[in-house]
């Protein structure tokens, strides 16, 4: 990757990066929910993250997940997964390796899903809405959940805990991880630093907002994300980009972040070219405090592109 020379780690930055990664994992299991769960005469109704009410007459026994990010949550909640989508980033827990593969996270094999006769499909918000009508036409209930922010994840645990009959277990896990997060934050340096989080793909470079995975964790670490200084933060394109804002070098120079984190998606060579062309080739890049102080850090894809699960908890 470009600018490898910026990987000089001070003691405080080692601590911050370590805390960032640990919290990214803890975030997968904690947050807060205002969504509804109702039980009436054996019928359970939930409201998912798209505001849809979904009814169940019994506990689902055959679950298909359209994102591997849900697998480790379902593992600790003893969910029976019969089908799963794959990703090149998120590893598959051992308990789900024998589950049928239903395509990749961005390209679901709908025929395979229907063949499995699931009684619950867990879909990722902003990614799988196009499949809902087809699955419901086949009598399969679909619950859409988000897994980006601290808040999203606790909600997902509560919903999945209810659906798998493991409500108390889910609440206990969330409580334990809450304590870990609080202990982590207590160890951080007290001074707030300005941070910019760049996200690079082969197509473009954007800034990550507080509702992205990295942005949410940076907020927990009490870092000030400069993108929040934009009066009207809008997404470049579409709902899937709602956690990002357009990249602007002039804005970056004006706000002069003390730390820069970089997340990425795609082929590393293509990303290197994009970062060099759009960001690092400008002489003005060298004037930014984070660059001058060797405080530019690449964050691991497996923790900050998709929800990282429970691997370090």
Residue ranges and their predicted role:
Residues 2-12, 16, 30-69, 168-198, ...:
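Bacterial Sec-exported substrate-binding components of ABC uptake systems
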Residues 20-28:
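Bacterial N-terminal signal peptides
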Residues 65-116, 120-125, 223-226, 230, ...:
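A short, structured surface patch at a secondary-structure boundary
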Residues 92-95, 127-159, 163:
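Flexible loop/hinge segments that line or gate small-molecule binding clefts
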Residues 102, 109-126, 140, 248-265:
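Proline-aspartate-enriched helix->loop->beta-strand connector
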Residues 130, 146-159, 193-217, 270:
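Extracytoplasmic ligand-binding site segments that recognize negatively charged/polar headgroups
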Residues 154-155, 162, 171, 182-185, ...:
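Structured C-terminal subdomain patch of bacterial secreted/periplasmic proteins
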Residues 204-271:
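Flexible, glycine-rich surface segments
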